[in-house]
Amino acid sequence: MLLGASALAMGTPVRAQSAANPQVRVEKNLEARMRDGVVLRADVYHPATPQRMPALLQRTPYSKNPQDANSLYHRLASAGFVVVVQDTRGRYMSDGVAVPHDEAADGYDTVEWVAALPFVDGRVGMFGGSYSATTQLLAASERPPHLVALFPSASYASRYDMVFQGGAFYLADGLGWNLGQAVDARRRALEPRADRDAAIGLSPDERRQLQTTWMWALPLDAVTALDLRRYAPGYFDMLAHPSFDPFWERFDVAARHGRFEVPAYHLTGWYDALLNGTLRNFAGMRAHAATDRARRNQRLIVGPWTHARPTSNTRRIGDVDYGEEAGFDSEALMVSWFRHWLGGAAAAGDYPSPPVRLFVMGENRWRDEQEWPLARARSTTLHLASDGSANTAAGNGRLAWHLAAGAPTDTFTYDPHTPVPTGTAGAYSRAPTDQRDLERRGDVLVYSSAPLDAPLEVIGPVTLVLWASSSARDTDFTARLVDVAPDGAARALTDGILRARYRGGRTSPELLRPGVPTEFTIDVGATANVFLAGHRVRLEVSSSNFPRFDRNPNTGAPFATDSAVVTARQTVWHSVAHPSRLVLPVVPR
């Protein structure tokens, strides 16, 4: 429903029946005044009851105005909750200036404002994914008295690690997200009488330019598209802090795990790029939350999903069908969770489910577990080996259960002008793409095991210990774990990247000595997959994953300042002296 300009200017609450659900009444643009006087606006979905009810709050920078009239908000309201959806500071209908992820104080103030609304019974839960997961966690870390429970989907534990993975910049999201925010900021500045409640994003032409021009532009800190420096200065703030420092500390959720006092249900997918953050938040809060009840009532579910909220019809990613069991009604789980904590059942005790539920790919079935990572998983090593030419899947790269004889090195050339493509369009979604086209590239080293005699169950974080040298003073190394079927189909499972200068940690960059073999420990991410009998375990090694990550220009210059790039000659070592190895968390069967 669109509001007239006068209603927008005055912030007048407007009431309407929901066309999608006549039992739900929608109240538009209720005003909440923050501690500094800035007014934020929210829409409220009222259930069909005159009674005071518990409330569920979502705070979003993407417009509180739903794109789908039959949205989650209506379902939650129909389940007996007052649903409050607020535009975050400086976005859409809310006043003020947006500072991305600076949501702790506003989150606290909004929770307490919601609890005091005359139609709310004083109990508040929070829900939402991605940025809206951040708004929950940062608010909860401030301990608002009336906050009872959380349902964060796809969350980060460290904003730095969300922006820089292994020191490499998440280019597709970092640039694409900020350009999307700039569109709203530009409209607010140039069209003050426009309908600010309507969601807005990049135009088709702007999306094309993002893919074909803007993400290729160098230097990174000279981007002028959409007057980005004026309308989304946060992009340049990120570029100015390529190492973890006090700028990032104020957004660090992991450092606040000991402050959490409420139960939380953490949801993510094996192909969500925020998977690692969600796993870390679950484990950290379960171990360190401030109360015993909060520690006991952290829950985790991980399915064969991407960055989007799963539904009962979510069973495919691309060409891979995970079967009927993969479909999952996350909204029903959310209703169950909040009914327990906000509907009176909490008095009966803890939430009645195992702490962890995982979808195990390969066998495509759900499994309940007691912890993450799994205590019974055993670190198992596969050694890299070759006869000196592991380039492409047709090469002679091998993964061996024991240190194997053979040539001590493989080499490839990394040219930033022709990077290895990410292969998927989503900035924060990966996919089980068939890798065979990429494995034909000479700049991709491919190491494969022999066909397995029995199933191999891998559940947990995967690590590559890589001995490598480079002709450059700084470069990147990438790793990807792949499940290869007997017919040759090569399904990507998880991947990682490390910028060489950050091999010693995210606070201490150190350039390479060209040509000197150096040990790199690459976090390849987590997975849950059974490699079936007859399948092969495969590892791909290269130096780029573009445009998900920026291209390392190989110069060793300060980050984001290079206007030109150089080619690097890369050498991967595998010998007794330099034992490159893939470390898998294998679960005994």
Predicted regions and their residues:
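N-terminal cap/lid segment of alpha/beta-hydrolase-fold proteins
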Residues: 18-51, 448-454
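Active-site-adjacent alpha-helix of alpha/beta-hydrolase-fold enzymes
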Residues: 276-298
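Cap/lid segment of the alpha/beta-hydrolase catalytic domain
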Residues: 47-115, 158, 162-164, 169-171, ...
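Accessory cap/linker subdomain of secreted extracellular hydrolases
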Residues: 78, 141-259
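N-terminal export leaders
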Residues: 1-2
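Short beta-strand/loop motif that positions the catalytic acidic residue
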Residues: 260, 266-268
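Alpha/beta-hydrolase fold nucleophile elbow
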Residues: 118-131
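C-terminal, loop-rich substrate-recognition/catalytic regions characterized by aromatic stacking residues
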Residues: 197-223, 310, 315-589
